[in-house]
Amino acid sequence: MTGPRRIHDVEGLNARLQAVTRRANIDLRYLHDDRTREHVVAATRDARRILDMGGGMRDRLGALGGRVETMDLNDIDEPGSNLSRPDILGDACSPFPEWMHGRYDAVIALALLEHVYDPGAAVANFRAALAPGGRLFLYVPWMWRYHAPRSLVFQDYQRFSRDGLAWLLRDFDEVTLYPIRGRFSAIANMARWWKPRVERRFGGRINRWLDVRTPDWRNAVQASGYFAEAVKSTAQE
């Protein structure tokens, strides 16, 4: 009896895929204490130029003035809201122009990749925009509800597991993933009232109280999302 007709080195491929996932560092410090925005502020304090994709950090980085450039697909200016016109109007998934290559010490894309139609192309653009040794900061959802507006001024395309995010960041030298929330707190967070009414009142301790009821609560795979920091090689390309 003959086996299946082999058309690919499937064992070698699976070994390479496993290696990509396993090389990502896992840090649980923000599992029940989401201080990721403070993390970004501290890590970019000395950056010469920062690209904030979608403007998700505009409220925290305003003191840096002209060192921060924002980019968005939509030209929105709404007085009284946290929205303002971007410095650069463009598509995260289409090739960035040459003048943007190597321009930034940090690229920030918080809660953005789920809204783009080609996250692999977007991450490649972010990497190209970074100077050697530059850092990419991401937040992506995993266990989270659909959240595009009815107007579809932006869309909701993707969710990212630990393995999927590690694969997206495979071309960076160093990758650290920070799970946000655990198994049960991620489920609770699916309710629209959980974060504004419960988390904001009790803080991260309420999520910890929910999650520690299982022996494997310090896990990296059942999360509402992931904050990630990825470092580009210092070698010139």
Predicted regions and their residues:
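S-adenosyl-L-methionine-dependent methyltransferase catalytic module, highlighting the catalytic core
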Residues: 117-127, 135-237
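Conserved N-terminal segment of class I S-adenosyl-L-methionine
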Residues: 1-106, 110, 223-226, 233-237
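Residues lining the SAM
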Residues: 110-113, 139
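Glycine-rich, phosphate-binding/catalytic loops in enzymes
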Residues: 66-70, 86-87, 124-129, 154-156
